[in-house]
Amino acid sequence: APTREQAQRDFVTDRTPVVVATNAFGMGIDKSNVRFVIHHNMPESIESYYQEAGRAGRDGEPSRCTLLWNESDIVTRRRLLDMGGPNERLTADEQDLVRRSKRQLLDGMIGYCRTTECLHRYMTRYFGEHDTPGTGHCAGGCVNCASTFATMDVTPVARAISMCVHDLGQHFG
C-alpha cells in the first residue's frame, strides 16, 4: 500500500507523468491535466467507460482516451458474468434479474466497441439524448469520424504492453 500511495502522490503532483494502473486507481483522484487514458481491454459497461475516460481533459485542454479491445474481451466479460457466484442475500429470481441487467450493460459496451458510427452520437443515444441540437456531433473528434474506418487487429501490441506491465511487477507509478 505505501508504494501505491507514493505512486498516487507522485502522479497527482506531476512528479510522475505516467501511471499504469487498474481502474480502481483513478477513483478519487482529482487531477485536471490528465492527457491520456488508455484502456487495455473492454470495460464492463459504457457507464464505467464514460467515468474512466472522463478522467482525461478535465481542464478543457485536448486529451485522448484510447480503447484497445478484441473479441476475446467479450468472451471473457460474458464468462465472468455467467460465473458470478450465488448471492445468499438474493433470491434466484433476483440473481437472474441482476445478471440480465449486467448483460444489458455489457451489450451496450459491445455495441460501442463495434460501431462504425460517430462515437459521440452512440454515447449520447445510449444515455437517452436523441438527436437534440448540439449532442452527438463531434466534427471529427472521435476516431470513427476523424478517419476512414478500417478494422485492425492490435492484439500483438496490446499483449506486448500487457507483458511489459506484468514484467515490471504491476506496481510501479
Regions found by a protein language model. Name each.
Residues 1-25, 29-173:
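C-terminal helicase lobe
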